[in-house]
């Protein structure tokens, strides 16, 4: 049975744009190779953290939505934990279909005059 998942991970802020793309594509490939489908990856950019993580005050946020049976999560999270690029990660099982990411969302209709 295929479930919807959302994974958010935070990369070190000192990574270059090429390194961010490399890490992002690495985890996307890992998920695809293990049977995940409908992958949507969005780099949210560098943001200030609410509290320091591993002595970093900023981090690069990446969000991944996908469908999978759940067996992929353990391998991906193990790689994130052992690697040095990811400073924090979280995977959540979604009850409903994920909301379209901003880049994939259709343009909103303008409000009707006088409404």
UniProtKB/Swiss-Prot annotation:
It holds the Pfam family Ribosomal_S6. This is Small ribosomal subunit protein bS6. Signal peptide: none annotated. One of its GO terms (molecular function) is structural constituent of ribosome. The keyword Ribosomal protein applies. GO terms for biological process: translation. It comes from the Bacteria. Keywords: Ribonucleoprotein, Ribosomal protein, RNA-binding, rRNA-binding. One of its GO terms (cellular component) is cytoplasm. Belongs to the bacterial ribosomal protein bS6 family. InterPro entries: Ribosomal_bS6, Ribosomal_bS6_sf, Ribosomal_S6_plastid/chlpt, Transl_elong_EF1B/ribsomal_bS6. The lineage of its organism: Bacteria, Bacillati, Cyanobacteriota, Cyanophyceae, Oscillatoriophycideae. Binds together with bS18 to 16S ribosomal RNA.
């Amino acid at each position: 049975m295929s479930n919807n998942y959302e994974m958010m991970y935070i990369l070190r802020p000192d990574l270059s744009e090429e390194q961010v793309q490399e890490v992002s594509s690495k985890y996307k490939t890992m998920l695809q190779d293990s049977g995940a489908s409908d992958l949507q990856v969005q780099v949210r950019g560098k943001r200030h953290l609410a509290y320091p993580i591993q002595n970093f005050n900023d981090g690069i946020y990446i969000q991944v939505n996908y469908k999978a049976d759940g067996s992929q999560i353990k391998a991906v999270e193990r790689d994130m934990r052992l690697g040095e690029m990811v400073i924090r990660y979280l995977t959540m099982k979604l009850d409903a279909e994920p909301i379209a990411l901003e880049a994939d969302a259709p343009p909103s209709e303008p409000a009707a005059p006088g409404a």
